[in-house]
Amino acid sequence: NAIAEVREAVDFLHYYAGQVRDDFDNETHRPLGPVVWISPWNFPLAIFTGQIAAALAAGNSVLAKPAEQTPLIAAQGVAILLEA
């Protein structure tokens, strides 16, 4: 259901924010560089958001391609992330 999907996306964001706070040291951690994520059609917001959050938390730039069945969900997710 949609509420569970949004909750899972928020959980991913909280998790990776905690990882940055607890485990990354800018003096020793170096980003890998640009990463590409292709998300599946199931869990279109949660998995898409989790992939982006993981890459950004590690300092990488992201090129994310949503599933062809769910482009509007991904577009709205990106808009919300940019607003945040």
Task: Name every feature range the model reports, one short phrase each.
Residues 3, 7, 12-84:
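Rossmann-like NAD(P) dinucleotide-binding subdomain of oxidoreductase/dehydrogenase enzymes
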